[in-house]
C-alpha cells in the first residue's frame, strides 16, 4: 500500500514519465502483476494507442487502460457481480418520470411542473448528483426535520426526497444504478486478489466526486501501489490558477492521513512538451502578477474575424497550409471550442476543404428521420391525428420510402390537406381524398390530364398505405394493457411496417457506397430503439399502464438516445470542447470562439438545488455536493490554461466581432492577458490580412474558385482588386485540372436578373389568341410585368391554406350585401334595427357554410370571427340606411356581371377592344352596385364598389391616369354602354364613381366623459362616407345629398359647398362630365397599351414604384423573380407623381363621342 503523486504544471513530463514507467515494466516482465491505468472515458482510446503504436512492445497482458466503470466490471468478473439488473440512463429517467406522475398530487413545490418532460430530466440529474456525493434519502429527510429553513427550500427538498425514496424503494433488490454499482465495487475491493497485486496509475483528472474519492481510497488501501498524476504546482491558495487540481490533492492528502500513509511526491518542473520559447513563456507567465514581456517568435497567433463562418473558413485554410507546407498530418492538429454553435459549422465547412475530422461529442438521435417518424407517430395518436404531427410523419419518408418521387407526392398531399383543413378522423374519410377533389386544388376549374390523374392516384394510394399503418399501430396499442404488451405491440408494429428490413437494406447500401458513418447511425438507431423497449419491459414488466402514459414514458426514453461514433480513420483532425477534450501533445492547436462570455463563460446554476441551498446544505449537514457556480467561475482560467497548453509547436486563438444574431462580441479578457505577455503579438484581422495577402485565400481548389468569383464581382463593380486574382483566373481557366465548374461560376458575374422577352408564337401559346381577362389582371401587369407573366403565363399558384384570407373576407361581405340588397330591392331606407339583425343572420346562415369548406364553423376562433362579421354587416347596413335616406339615387343592380357574350339577360355586354397586334381584348368582371337617378328623361348612374380594405377604398386619379387603377372607369364605361339592358333612358350620364369601405369603425376619445351615445352613433356612420369622383353637374350634386346647402360638407359623399353655393375645393372630389369621359376613353387606351405589351412578350422584373412603395411588399412571386434592390433597382419603373391628373387628362386630345351608348 504505497501512494505516489506526480505533481507539476502542464507539459512537464508527468504523463510521459508514467507511460515510460509502465512500458519499462511491460518490457521487463510481460506477464507480471497487473498494471491499471485509470483515465477519463474520452482519453482511454488515445492512451491505448500510445501502447499499441510503440514498436518496442511486442504485446503484453499486464496493462489495461480503464475508466472507473470499466474497472468495476473487471473486478466483478473476478469476485462476482451484483444480482440486480443495471439501469441505463434512459431506463432511470423513464422510471423517475413515471414515479413523478404517480406522486404528483403529493408534491408541494413541483406539482405544476410534474407533467413537463424537462422536469423529470432535471430530477434524474439531481438524484444522480446526490448519489455521486453519497447523499441518501435519509440524509435529506433528517436534514429537513432537524433544520429551520425557508418554506420554498423545505418544500423543494421534501419533493425531491419523496421521489428519491420512492425511486430507491422501486429499485431495491431488483435494479441498480451506475452510481450504486460503483458503491458495490467499493464493497468488493477487499475480495479481489487481482487488485491486491496491481500497480494503479490515475491520470487525466482534475476533479472527482465523493463516490470517486471513495473508490480511490479503496484502491490506495487494497492495491499494491497507486500513482496519481495532477496538473498543479501544489499551491493550495483558493484563488490559485490550479485551485481545482490542488483541491484534489488536498482530498488525497486527507485520504492518506485516514489510512495513516505518506504521499511520495515527485515534482516536475522542467518543461518538455513545448518546442519553442513562445509556448514555454505562455505556460509559465499566464498566471503571474508581474508580467515579463518577451518578443513573440510567431508560434502564437490571434485571429479576429467578423463572423463565426469566416473564422472557421480561415482555420480550415490554415490547416491546409500546415499539412502542405509544414508536413504535418491531420492527427497532429486539434480544434477546441466552447460555444456549441461551432459544432454545426465544423460539419458544414470542413468537408468543403476535404479535411477529415472527428468531433469528440455525443449527438442526440432525436433528429434522425427514423426517430422523428417514431416520435411523430406517437404524437399522432396522442393528439388525435392533428395535421402537424401527421405531416412530420409523412415527411420523414420512412413509411413512404417504397414510392418513387415520394417527397413530391407528400408535397401534393400536404397542399391538399392544408387547403381542405384535414385533421382528426377526417384523415380516414376516403371520400375526402377522392382524385376528383385534387383536380380543384388551388384552382377553380381544371381538367386533369392523364399524367396528373396517375400522380394523384399515387398520392391517394400513399396516403392510404400510411393511414393503414397508423391504424394498425393504434389498434395494436389500444389492445395492450401492460407495459410488456405495449412494448410487444410496438415492436410488432415496426415489423408490420417492415422497418427492420428497410433499415438493414439502407445500411448495406450506405456501406457499399463508403458512407460508413451513416450506416453506423442506422445500426445505432435500431439497437437504441430495441434497448428502450427492453428497458421498458425490464423496469415495468407486467405493470398495468394507460396507453397515454406508456407513450409519454417511451418518448422520454427516446430523448436519451445518443450516437456514439467511433473515428473512421486515425489520421484526422481532433475536435472537442475545451472542458472535456483530451488532445495532448498536438503540433498545432486552434482555440476558436475566444470571446468574452464564452471564455470565461458565465456559470449559472442549472440544477434543482441552487448554489445558496448547496452552501447551506454543506454548512449545516457537513455534506459536500457538486461545485457551486462561483467555484466553477474561479476555474475558468484553468480551463483556458489546459486548453492552450495542449500544443507542442503552435497555438492559434480566434474570436469573432459579431454574434449569430448580429450582436457585438468582445474579445476574451484572457486573450488580452496573453497579448500582454509578448512584444509584437499583434491581432490579425482576417479580412485585412487577406486584402494584403490575397494568395493566402488560395489554399483549396474549389473554395479558391468561390473566392475568385467574389473578387471578380468586386472588380466588375470598379472596386480595387489585387492583380493576383486576375492572374489566378487565367491560371485556373487554362488548367484542365482546375477549371471544372469555372464557367458556371463566371456566368453569375454578369447575372442581372433579366428575363427573356417572349416570342409572338409563345405569347399566343401562353395567353391564347384572344385575351379574356378581368380588370385586376391588367392592373397586375402595370404593377410588374413579371407578376403578370408568373400568374397568367406560367399560372403559378400559391398554396391555398385552410384559413381565412383577406380576399375571402371581401367575398363574404360582397355576397352578404348582395343577398340582403336583393331581398329589400335596394331600399335601405326601410331597414330598422330588428330587420337589419334578421337579414344579417339569414345571409350569414346562407353564405358562411360555403366559404372554404365551412371554414368559419371549424373552430371556436372562426365562430367568434363569424359573429364579428355579422356585427360589421349590421353597422354597414345602418350606414347604408343613413346614406339612402338623404340621397335621390336608388340602388338598382347588385353584383352585376359583364362579359363579351352575356350568359343571361342580367349580364352586361363588354365592348371588345383590339391590341396593336390585332388580338381581341375581352374584359369581364362584376360591378358591386349600380345606383340610378332619372330627371327630365336623363338617367344618372353611380358606380358603388365595396372594399374591405381601407387602402384600396380610395380613387387615386394619378393611378387612373397611368393605368394603375382601371376598375372604376371600366365599370362606368360598361354601364354607359348598356343603358337598354339596365332599363335606363336614352340619355345616360355618369354620376359618381364611389368606394364604400366595409369595416368596423373606431372612434377615439380622450376620456369616458367625452362619450355622447347619440353623437357616437352619428360619428360611426360618418366613417362610412363614400370616396371617389363625382360629376360636377348640379343635378348630380343635388341628388347625391339632398341636404346640401351653402357652407355644408356632406358626410355621405365627397362634396362640400362654399358660402356662395359653389363647390368647395377642399371638401369636394369632382370633375366635369367631359373630363370623366376623357378618363374613360384614356382608360380604354391604357387597356389596349397594356394588352399589346402582354402579347408583345414583356416579362421584365420591373415593379412600378409609386409613393416610395413597391408592389413587391405584397407579391407572392418574390421567390420566383428573385427581385433584388441592388440588382434590379435600375429597372424600377416610376411615373411623374407631381402631375395634376385632371389637368393632364384635359390636355389630351381624344376623338370620341361622349354620352349615350358608345
Swiss-Prot record:
[4Fe-4S] cluster binds at residues 784, 1112, 1115, 1121. The keyword Nuclease applies. Coiled coil: none annotated. Residues 269-583 form the UvrD-like helicase C-terminal domain. Its cofactor is Mg(2+); [4Fe-4S] cluster. Gene3D superfamilies: 3.90.320.10, P-loop containing nucleotide triphosphate hydrolases (3.40.50.300). GO terms for biological process: double-strand break repair via homologous recombination. Pfam families: ADDB_N, PDDEXK_1, UvrD_C. Keywords: 4Fe-4S, ATP-binding, DNA damage, DNA repair, DNA-binding, Exonuclease, Helicase, Hydrolase, Iron, Iron-sulfur, Metal-binding, Nuclease, Nucleotide-binding. Its EC number is 3.1.-.-. It is an enzyme of class 3 (hydrolase). One of its GO terms (molecular function) is helicase activity. ATP binds at residues 8-15. Belongs to the helicase family. AddB/RexB type 1 subfamily. Heterodimer of AddA and AddB. The heterodimer acts as both an ATP-dependent DNA helicase and an ATP-dependent, dual-direction single-stranded exonuclease. Recognizes the chi site generating a DNA molecule suitable for the initiation of homologous recombination. The AddB subunit has 5' -> 3' nuclease activity but not helicase activity. This is ATP-dependent helicase/deoxyribonuclease subunit B. It comes from Staphylococcus aureus (strain MSSA476).
